[in-house]
Amino acid sequence: GSIGMIGDTGDPTCYEFGLQAIKKVGGLGVAIIKPRSNEEIIKRIRMAEEAGAVAVGVDLDGAGLVTMKLFGQPVGPKTVEDLKELVASTKLPFIAKGIMSVDEALACVEAGVNTIVVSNHGGRVLDYCQASCDVLEDIVKAVGDKITVLADGSVREGVDVLKYLALGAKGVLVGRPLIWGSIGGRKEGVTTIMNTLKSQLSQAMILTGTDDVKSVSNKIITK
């Protein structure tokens, strides 16, 4: 299955429009917030709760986004204590996005985070950093039995989803292709992209002898 995510940007109206979309579909959505001050994040968590979101989170690597500075929106890194405060502020599952090391993943476990997303923000926050697929397996080995691990980055075809699942992710986030689909074809464009990814994933599973997305063997990956 799939579920939509909305984001927080330098333009505050973007987050508000996203929450409206979550309301429109009866709460079937996740709100991801930039690493602002905890006070500002908690305000946005309350807005997400009122919209009926099923989960909230913070994309921690957004601390380095130039676009936030251009809009005069202060962001910064979070400590374990900061994360503990955010986790305690809501009854919704809390997601930490932008995790790229075992140490960061362990810090999230300590803070009580429910889910992490292994992600380098599409390579847009730090040049020359590793790709998500380079670090995912080690992170899963370290914390996969303690916390839900998702991943994203360069997912362009269904086989890319299968690769991440084989490396240990429990789910995969897709961004750019869906944006392209929405700009070019609105709702129908997004539906086409999703159906294409699903078809490609199914075909890749057949050709690798994979019966279930919940039990993808890492033996199908060549390193």
Give residue ranges: language-model regions.
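Conserved mixed alpha/beta catalytic, RNA-binding, or beta-rich assembly cores of soluble enzyme
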Residues: 120-123, 144
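Alpha/beta catalytic cores of nucleotide-metabolism and tRNA/nucleoside-modifying enzymes
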Residues: 133-223
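Short beta-strands and strand-loop turn motifs
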Residues: 59-60, 117-120, 176
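Charged helix-capping and loop-helix junction motifs
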Residues: 73-76, 130-136
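Conserved, mostly hydrophobic/aromatic
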Residues: 58, 86, 108, 116, ...
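Glycine-rich beta-to-alpha transition loops that act as phosphate-gripper elements at the mouths
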Residues: 35-36, 95-102, 129, 148-161
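Active-site entrance/lid segments in N-terminal catalytic domains of soluble metabolic enzymes
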Residues: 1-106, 110, 122-125
